[in-house]
Swiss-Prot record:
Cholesterol transporter that mediates non-vesicular transport of cholesterol from the plasma membrane (PM) to the endoplasmic reticulum (ER). Contains unique domains for binding cholesterol and the PM, thereby serving as a molecular bridge for the transfer of cholesterol from the PM to the ER. Plays a crucial role in cholesterol homeostasis and has the unique ability to localize to the PM based on the level of membrane cholesterol. The keyword Metal-binding does not apply. One of its GO terms (molecular function) is cholesterol transfer activity. Its main location: endoplasmic reticulum. GO terms for biological process: cellular response to cholesterol; intracellular sterol transport. Keywords: Cell membrane, Endoplasmic reticulum, Lipid transport, Lipid-binding, Membrane, Transmembrane, Transmembrane helix, Transport. This is Protein Aster-C.
Length: 662
């Protein structure tokens, strides 16, 4: 029957009409939105259009692309130029805790919550924030941040990493107050810090995002024309790349060069290595354009001051397009050392690196010579052991380092080397690695600029606590490592320049001393422990001494552990004897108790037997009396029967006599 509607059809029609009425009511009375001082607060209200989106809101997106699409979909009133930088899971404290996500862009701080179709949307312009503080939930748990504007206070809690979230918001807030905008490099670095290297964007989307950032961002008043020209030149020279950013390069917290097995290299060997190196270096067919050197530490969001000597020598410096890593810039300094000499110091088996490795407790170094690859790059592999003596990481760890000299390098003018190191024995070593990039740029005949940038990369994403532990230990180790490397290079610079000075020219000597006032001021206190005479010493004796110290340490440790084990054995023997005594006493007590129970049972048995005998005797006596009485009664019965018989006989005789007579 096609014309008659079924019961299910009627119910569906009723439900759809009810839903239509509710939807029309919500559309006629939408959730009110109030805007005060660029603080947009969308009042709470049900959202019937986004019922399917409730579950997608709670399921965390895994890539930056998904998060950015959520951000654009949830905050449509924001300018199109705003790009998501970070987002954090948190809760807004109102009458109840509204669990949601906090989205951070360059100029806005937004919050979105969707709990069972009940939406809350808040947008705060960073320039309108008067102050922000770290707070504690219930005055006990340090996981909250309070944002205060001129008109309202917002208390966000339940942060997984409160300090890191606070620092990111605070830095962007300060940039807005100082009227500074993020550069493309800073923007990409912040994305990789928050979302990792896997952003979910293809090459076209990444290029469009970069171009939109460069085109839209206004020039900050505080930025110099040199920075602007540098950015323009960087745009023009972006087609010249030294390496693909998609290739992960392994490195570690401490990277060095040196071969302990060749500790006693002489000048002839170093010259041979120099000739080999020169023969392998390719030359560029195209001259690279000049780009001003920038010293921005992207991770710390502050500008590193350049030396005065670098400014004065910038005319003679052959600058190349710089491509620092997205981590931290640890060294950016001009040294009074030629570019080729700097390369020899850092990337050959030089006495400098052997001495530096010894000071860093690096032993058992084995390295391969530079070999040319098919693509034109050159490769060098090293293995060594790092003595740590840390309770968290152990006594030592093996490491493998791969150094890549790119084909864009020019002999005695420009060197670009990536150092890839992998540690094998530290905790969570399969989760992370670091990449160190060395850029040596010729400034003049006897000067060069050394730039060292480092990035911490992950093979697989660890959970929050492990990641913070890895980053804390890795960055502190890297900072300590490169501080000492810079200090030792300054000492080597001073020694090399003193060696080439003419002692007969006093004025020249004085002028040279005035030139090196910069070095004397910037060398850390650690350099005072070194002397120029130490440079000529080989590192083999130091390494042997380290080995002996480790052997002595191992012997002492074995003795201590043996004593400890012996004490444990004695303690176990004592406990065993005491336990045996306790067991023997328990068994004796058990036997005594058993004997007592047996004796009690025997006495009770004797008493019961006597009573039984007495009872039997009484019963026998009573039975005898009964039998005696029975016999007497039987005898009486017998006598009675005899008398009766006699009576019957007498009667019979009388009857017989009477019959005869009759």
């Amino acid at each position: 029957m096609e014309g008659a509607p079924t019961v299910r059809q009627v119910m569906n029609e009723g439900d759809s009409s009810l839903a239509t009425d509710l939807q029309e009511d919500v559309e006629e009375n939408p959730s009110p939105t109030v805007e005060e001082n660029n603080v947009v607060v969308k009042k709470q209200g049900p959202n019937l259009h986004n019922w399917s989106g409730d579950w997608s809101f709670w399921i965390s997106s895994s890539t930056y692309k998904d998060r950015n699409e959520e951000y654009r979909r949830q905050f449509t009133h924001l300018p199109d130029t705003e790009r998501l930088i970070a987002d954090y899971a948190c809760a807004l404290q109102r009458d109840i805790l509204l669990q949601g996500r906090l989205y951070l862009s360059e100029n806005w701080l937004c919050f979105y919550s969707n709990i069972f179709r009940w939406e809350t949307t808040i947008s705060i312009a960073l320039k309108n924030i008067t102050f922000m503080t770290k707070e504690k939930t219930a005055r006990l748990i340090p996981n909250a941040i309070q944002i205060v504007t001129e008109s309202e206070k917002f208390f966000f809690t339940s942060f997984g990493a409160r300090d890191r979230s606070y620092l990111s918001i605070f830095r962007l807030w300060q940039n807005v107050l100082l009227d500074k905008s993020l550069t493309r490099q800073e923007f990409w670095q912040l994305l990789q810090q928050n979302y990792g290297t896997e952003l979910g964007l293809n090459a076209e989307e990444m290029e469009n995002l970069s171009l939109s950032i460069e085109d839209v961002q206004p020039r900050s008043p505080g930025r110099s024309s040199l920075d602007d020209s540098g950015e323009r030149d960087e745009k023009l020279s972006k087609s010249i790349s030294f390496t693909s950013e998609s290739i992960s390069r392994v490195s570690e917290t401490e990277s060095f060069d040196g071969n302990s097995s060749k500790g006693g290299l002489g000048k002839e060997e170093s010259q041979n290595e120099k000739q080999t190196k020169k023969s392998l270096l390719p030359t560029l067919e195209k001259k690279l354009t000049r780009v001003p050197s920038k010293s921005l530490d992207l991770n710390k969001n502050e500008y590193l001051s350049l030396d005065k000597s670098s400014t004065s020598d910038s005319v003679d410096e052959e600058n190349v397009p710089e491509k620092d890593l997205h981590g931290r810039l640890f060294i950016n300094r001009i040294f009074h050392i030629s570019a080729d000499r700097m390369f020899e110091l850092l990337f050959t088996s030089s006495r400098f690196m052997q001495k530096f490795a010894s000071s860093r407790n690096i032993i058992d170094v084995v390295s391969t010579p530079w070999t040319a690859e098919l693509g034109g790059d050159q490769l060098r592999t090293m293995t060594y052991t790092i003595v740590l003596n840390s309770p968290l990481t152990g006594k030592c760890t093996a490491a493998t380092e791969k150094q890549t000299l790119y084909k864009e390098s020019r002999e005695a003018r420009f060197y670009l080397v990536d150092s890839e190191v992998l540690t094998h024995d530290v905790p969570y070593h399969d989760y992370f690695y670091t990449v160190n990039r060395y850029c040596i740029i010729r400034s003049s005949k006897q000067k060069c600029r050394l730039r060292v940038s480092t990035d911490l990369k992950y093979r697989k994403q660890p959970w929050g606590l492990v990641k913070s532990l890895i980053e804390k230990n890795s960055w502190s180790s890297l900072e300590d490592y490169f501080k000492q490397l810079e200090s030792d290079l300054l000492i080597e610079e001073s020694v090399l320049n003193q060696a080439i000075e003419d002692p007969g020219k006093l004025t020249g000597l004085r002028r040279r001393r005035r030139t090196f006032n910069r070095t004397a001021e910037t060398v850390p206190k650690l350099s005072s422990q070194h002397s120029s005479g130490d440079v000529g010493l080989g590192a083999k004796g130091d390494i042997t001494g380290k080995k002996k110290e480790m052997e002595n340490y191992n012997v002492t440790l074995i003795v201590v552990m043996s004593i400890f084990v012996l004490l444990l054995v004695l303690l176990n023997v004592t406990l065993f004897l005491k336990l045996s005594k306790i067991e023997h006493a328990a068994q004796s007590f058990y036997r005594l108790r058993l004997q007592e129970e047996k004796s009690l049972n025997l006495a009770s048995d004797m008493v019961s037997r006597a009573e039984t005998i007495q009872k039997n005797k009484d019963q026998a006596h009573r039975l005898k009396g009964v039998l005696r009485d029975s016999i007497v009664m039987l005898e009486q019965l017998k006598s009675s029967l005899i008398m009766l018989q006699k009576t019957f006989d007498l009667l019979n005789k009388n009857k017989t006599g009477m019959a005869v007579e009759s």
